[in-house]
Structures are given as structure tokens and as C-alpha cells.
Amino acid sequence: MTYIIFAFAALFEIAGCFAFWAWLKLENPVWWLAPGMVSLALFAWILTLVPSEAAGRTFAAYGGIYILASLLWLWLVESRVPDRYDIGGALICLAGASLILFAPRG
């Protein structure tokens, strides 16, 4: 369930940030900020649904999923194929996020 929450959080965070990017860098109209802000608020709320006692650990584990989702966005939305360094870096980050998420704690 955590991965599903992380996936939705990433979608809303990336979409929200892209709205700001589109306004500032692509010169889209200022009204792009309204759905961007709603999307970022949904991102923040959804991340609170992760069953965890520590916000920082949740955010750190989520970081790996965010990187993977960002590269998917790069490929599917921006039509730019991730290169070997993108993929290698993402794999390293996912390994770290998995360690944070699944480490035995007691």
C-alpha cells in the first residue's frame, strides 16, 4: 500500500511543480498556478497517509519513488528518453529508499 501512496504523491508533486515550471520557463499563463497549488496540497496530504511514525524517514523513502516518477515524467510527458546516468542514478536511489523503507527497526 505504501508504494501506491508514494506513486500518487509523486504524481501530484511532479504535476504541481511542472505547473510552476510551465508558467515560469515555458511562458504558460499564470492560471497554471491554480491547479499546480491544488496538486501540491494533495501531494502533501497524500504523503501523510503513509503508515509511519517518522515524517523524515517517510520523506527519505519517498525520495526514491519521486526520482523514478520524475524520470517517467521526463520520458512520457516531456518525450525525452532518460540516459544511462539517469537510470543508474535512479537505481542507486531506489536501493537506498528500499533500505530505509524495509530496514528492521526495533
From Swiss-Prot:
The keyword Electron transport does not apply. PANTHER family: UPF0060 MEMBRANE PROTEIN YNFA. Belongs to the UPF0060 family. Coiled coil: none annotated. SUPFAM superfamilies: Multidrug resistance efflux transporter EmrE. It comes from the Bacteria. The keyword rRNA processing does not apply. This is UPF0060 membrane protein RL1530. Its main location: membrane. The chain crosses the membrane at residues 4-24, 30-50, 58-78, 86-106. Pfam families: UPF0060 (PF02694). It is a multi-pass membrane protein. NCBIfam families: PRK02237.1. Keywords: Cell inner membrane, Cell membrane, Membrane, Transmembrane, Transmembrane helix. The lineage of its organism: Bacteria, Pseudomonadati, Pseudomonadota, Alphaproteobacteria, Hyphomicrobiales. It is found in: Cell inner membrane. GO terms for cellular component: plasma membrane.
